[in-house]
């Protein structure tokens, strides 16, 4: 009977019937086994996992895909919220700040908020209000810092004066004196130069001739020839590079008498105070000499205050009179004679 029924059906119905039977068989064979244990209804388990990790999908099994996505894992990672941090940073800044940095940070924060979209604005409305409050306080702090910076720049700079270098002043004075002398002498010696030029033109050539008679007499004696040349070189080298003519670059040679004369005549020192410079066993360096001269100048420049017992704020007026000892003795003797 079954066979008759199947053959009595139209060919289209037969095809649909066979497909339905095959689907039932495939549904029965679809099973999942984990650790050799079969799991019933795996579709329900998958739905429950999606509800746990992505509750907004509810019963749908659609995976959200964002732009510029490279893998499926990125759809399950929660989106990072970029909070603006310039409000917190302004609380830890110093009083003096540069206004340009604040403007750049505000521009960057505005662009980042615009690119994030409407969902970011709806989720973080409270954060926007907090950031606007922080921004207003930040602008007020920047205005105060700009005002303090302008006041500091407008105030006159403090000038620190270093101690005077007397030796350097003496050397400069000496150079100026030499330059003035050379300029005055150059103007007066114009005619002398013309005369010297004429003399040089009329001069004959001068040459030194060395006598090598003892060496020429025996041309095979090379030892004496070499010794003679070596001795001449030694003498020339010794004259140029003798210890007397050698002066280090850091050393300065001073004429003590000329230096004392400069200090007395030009700077107003007392010659009696400068006697220590004439000592033969003076082991002072240039720095120590300048210290002593500064001490003498300060002692001379500070006015001497003599107290005569004037009125003070916390004391009664007093009058101090200095009387010599013999006058005191005479006054005491006269008082005894008059009273006795």
Curated annotation (Swiss-Prot):
Propeptide segments, given as residue ranges = 315-340
Q: Which factors induce or repress this protein, as stated in its UniProt record?
A: Up-regulated upon milbemycins A3 oxim derivative (A3Ox) treatment.
Membrane topology category: Lipid-anchor; GPI-anchor
Q: Quick one: where is this thing mainly located?
A: membrane
Segments of skewed composition (Low complexity): 99-115, 182-191
| Signal peptide as annotated in the record | 1-29
- Assigned keywords, A-Z: Cell membrane, Glycoprotein, GPI-anchor, Lipoprotein, Membrane, Secreted, Signal
Asked if the keyword Secreted belongs to this entry, the reply reads yes
Would you say which domain of life the source belongs to? Eukaryota
Please give the coiled-coil regions recorded for this protein.
Answer: none
Q: Where is the composition biased (Basic and acidic residues)?
A: 192-202
Q: Name one GO cellular component term.
A: plasma membrane
The subcellular localization recorded is: Cell membrane; Secreted
Query: Which residue positions carry a glycan here?
Result: 127, 270
Region Disordered: start and end of each range? Answer: 99-154, 181-212
Q: Where is the lipid attached (GPI-anchor amidated asparagine)?
A: 314
Write down what this protein is called.
Predicted GPI-anchored protein 46
Organism encoding this protein? Candida albicans (strain SC5314 / ATCC MYA-2876) (Yeast)
Q: Which lineage do the record's taxonomy fields give for this organism?
A: Eukaryota, Fungi, Dikarya, Ascomycota, Saccharomycotina
Gene that codes for this? PGA46
């Amino acid at each position: 009977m079954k066979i008759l029924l199947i053959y009595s059906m139209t060919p289209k119905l037969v095809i649909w019937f066979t497909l339905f039977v095959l689907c039932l068989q495939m549904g029965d064979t679809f099973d999942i086994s984990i650790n050799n244990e079969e799991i019933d209804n795996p579709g329900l388990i998958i739905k429950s996992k999606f509800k746990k990790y992505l509750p907004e999908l509810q019963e749908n099994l659609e995976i959200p895909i964002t732009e510029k996505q490279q893998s499926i894992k990125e759809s399950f990672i929660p989106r990072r919220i970029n909070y603006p941090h310039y409000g917190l940073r302004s609380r830890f800044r110093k009083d003096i700040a540069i206004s340009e940095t604040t403007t750049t940070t505000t521009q960057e924060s505005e662009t980042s908020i615009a690119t994030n979209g409407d969902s970011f604005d709806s989720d973080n409305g409270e954060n926007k209000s907090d950031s606007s409050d922080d921004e207003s306080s930040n602008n007020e702090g920047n205005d105060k810092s700009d005002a303090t910076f302008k006041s500091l720049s407008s105030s006159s700079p403090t000038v620190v004066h270093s101690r005077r270098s007397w030796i350097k002043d003496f050397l400069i004075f000496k150079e100026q004196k030499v330059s003035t002398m050379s300029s005055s002498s150059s103007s007066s010696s114009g005619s002398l130069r013309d005369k010297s030029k004429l003399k040089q033109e009329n001069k004959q050539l001068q040459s030194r001739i060395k006598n090598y008679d003892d060496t020429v007499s025996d041309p095979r004696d090379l030892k004496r020839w070499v010794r003679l040349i070596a001795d001449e070189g030694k003498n020339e080298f010794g004259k140029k590079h003798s210890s007397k003519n050698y002066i280090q670059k850091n050393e300065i040679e001073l004429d003590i008498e000329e230096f004392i004369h400069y200090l007395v005549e030009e700077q107003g020192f007392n010659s009696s105070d400068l006697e220590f410079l004439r000592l033969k066993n003076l082991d002072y360096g240039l720095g120590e000499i300048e210290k002593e001269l500064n001490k003498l100048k300060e002692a001379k420049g500070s006015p001497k205050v003599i107290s005569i017992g004037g009125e003070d704020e916390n004391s009664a007026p007093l009058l101090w009179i200095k009387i010599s000892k013999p006058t005191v003795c005479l006054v005491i003797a006269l008082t005894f004679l008059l009273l006795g």
